[in-house]
Amino acid sequence: MASVPKRHTYGGNVVTDRDRHSLQRNNEILHPIHKNQRKHATFGPYIIGSTLGEGEFGKVKLGWTKASSSNEVPKQVAIKLIRRDTIKKDADKEIKIYREINALKHLTHPNIIYLEEVLQNSKYIGIVLEFVSGGEFYKYIQRKRRLKESSACRLFAQLISGVNYMHYKGLVHRDLKLENLLLDKHENLVITDFGFVNEFFEDNELMKTSCGSPCYAAPELVVSTKAYEARKADVWSCGVILYAMLAGYLPWDDDHENPTGDDIARLYKYITQTPLKFPEYITPIPRDLLRRILVPNPRRRINLQTIKRHVWLKPHEAFLSIQPNYWDEHLQKERPKPPNKGDVGRHSTYSSSASSYSKSRDRNSLIIESTLEQHRMSPQLATSRPASPTFSTGSKVVLNDTKNDMKESNINGERTSASCRYTRDSKGNGQTQIEQVSARHSSRGNKHTSVAGLVTIPGSPTTARTRNAPSSKLTEHVKDSSQTSFTQEEFHRIGNYHVPRSRPRPTSYYPGLSRNTADNSLADIPVNKLGSNGRLTDAKDPVPLNAIHDTNKATISNNSIMLLSEGPAAKTSPVDYHYAIGDLNHGDKPITEVIDKINKDLTHKAAENGFPRESIDPESTSTILVTKEPTNSTDEDHVESQLENVGHSSNKSDASSDKDSKKIYEKKRFSFMSLYSSLNGSRSTVESRTSKGNAPPVSSRNPSGQSNRSNIKITQQQPRNLSDRVPNPDKKINDNRIRDNAPSYAESENPGRSVRASVMVSTLREENRSELSNEGNNVEAQTSTARKVLNFFKRRSMRV
């Protein structure tokens, strides 16, 4: 028998341990001890919760808004957290991140994930999306084994409606698969993951980048090196998803020699040579639809309009008959207006929840832009797509730098693209030019097939989403376009380029992705610094939002803010991207300052040596002539690239220029078939080739008094894939020669070229920034010859 411990008191009473514990509990109830509550992890104005999933970029966390009052119900969001140090190591990942951000800004559809805002701190980049509580569609089919025909028909109609809306906006997803689809709480389909999204045009939608996932990618992306129709590739992926809904497994999954599908070459050879088979429980009507969609030949494959008219989708005919522009107008009315508090000039944003967020702006908040809530007001600036555009391999975008320095940039498109030139004066004289463009579009009489305008809300930092507005109405409100202004700083774009060597999982297969082409317009992210006290501070120099300068006299900085001239996702206000402490700024010197130093140096040399010299004129020193052969078919996409130097120079410089001018670059798009036939299916990622440009010819000293002039013709080759076409000059600078660096080519580009910009985000090479930043130092090093001559005569006079 166990004894109970006892303790005698002075009063003679016996108190046991049980009584003592009961007294302690009573004391805790009567006199509670306030312990320190556990602090929640926060990211900007959101409280971070559990992990919803983990993908290629990082973890997706559940978040909810901070309640400002007891009656307020927090709103749940999904925050995709991306470590910034991982972006520095992988340039492809950076492209996909900014592509997704800029594409989601322009999509307002119930079956497409909605972008709330974009946040950033010193460690993470957070993409705040709406929370879809139904889970992944892939796991949903696994639980159900297969879907009933009625349920599959409803979900497939929602998928077709969302994809048709994207195509109407001029965007293609190119990575539709079960893993990129979600379900909401009402089991409605939601399309996500826009990392491979790209822009196309009605007149020419051919693309050359092989991307997507095995089994979901169309055969023309894999077995052929020719350009493919982007919309037909999305149609194929929709057919594979429909087959998986009805059958419970993917089509062409019965190859016994390749059961796992790791051998991509054998898989697509089996797809192209084997007829489609169906399980017995699939009825004839959906079989007919699948036989029309899953056709290896894209010319025989039906389009989305034919799919919507199919008899199997007749129960959802009313839903599919809704025009895409209706979703923009309808969802804009449903969104509550954001509270108009605070200073309008401050580049702050508002949240999309029911709360007013009056306190979040005063906290250490990283709120950047709430693209969800936009109220409809008179547009200030909008652009529309021309009906019959001209083709060009390159286009120019004119920006406004933080130092008001103008630079010029060539954007090599992944495909031939339509473009329209918009030039605006910083004094607000661009109204007449916009009206001329709008009048030119309306005079053609052709109906625009897609909406291409972002309109700016007066008195608000946010922008309204695109909607179908006639050009005549848009020009009525251009007069107020000079009212909106915002502050900006340089945004550090990481240019550490390399191709990932580790083999990714089969569901994220993207071997042909590269980093140039039409993505240079994605550096359009204004920045507000985060002060030392943790509060957001505005930039000092306000710059007009619509101050688009002349392209003849200006050049572009890699870190400036781009204003897209037109296109299906053209916009006047990009995603506001706050800058974090510890980031690097590249203070590029303007090319004009470098040229001024060269002129002073040459003038000084000529005065010392007694030679007549002419100052270097940036417009006459070099002339770039960009020529392009019209691309009417997939085979006519090879353009020769030559460098010619015509002028009076030394024999060495002539020999070097002749040697450089004979190099011809031929680049073909990557083919999965060629890769796996050579590597036996051992790797799923391949390094994209990068063509290295040659340094420009040297303009040497001419003691005979003749002026050095060179006409340089550059014919750029149209890339077969998205590989870089950035020249990388690596030459020694002699004291007797003055080298013309690569950025000087952009200054005298043909002003007659039309302007076009893409919605996609791209990264620029670090070498180009280092060239611009080091030009001033190189010029100072070149002054040694004149200085030596001057010092020589000084010393000689002192001897006497």
UniProtKB/Swiss-Prot annotation:
Positions of the UniProt region annotated as Disordered: 331-397, 438-487, 629-661, 678-754
Protein name per the record: Serine/threonine-protein kinase KIN4
Function, as annotated: This protein is probably a serine/threonine protein kinase.
UniProt biased composition (Low complexity): 348-358
Pfam families in the cross-refs: Pkinase
GO biological process assignments: mitotic spindle orientation checkpoint signaling; peroxisome inheritance; protein localization to spindle pole body; vacuole inheritance
Active site: D175 (proton acceptor)
GO CC terms of this entry: cell cortex; cellular bud neck; spindle pole body
SMART domains: S_TKc
Enzyme Commission identifier(s): 2.7.11.1
Chain positions found as Phosphoserine: S365, S388, S521, S748
Note: Present with 143 molecules/cell in log phase SD medium.
Domain Protein kinase: 46-313
Keywords, ordered alphabetically: ATP-binding, Kinase, Nucleotide-binding, Phosphoprotein, Serine/threonine-protein kinase, Transferase
Gene giving rise to this polypeptide: KIN4
Catalysed transformations (reactions): L-seryl-[protein] + ATP = O-phospho-L-seryl-[protein] + ADP + H(+); L-threonyl-[protein] + ATP = O-phospho-L-threonyl-[protein] + ADP + H(+)
Biased composition (Polar residues): 380-395, 459-473, 678-721
Binding-site positions, ATP: L52, G53, E54, G55, E56, F57, G58, K59, V60, K80
Similarity comment: Belongs to the protein kinase superfamily. Ser/Thr protein kinase family.
Composition bias type Basic and acidic residues, residue spans: 727-740
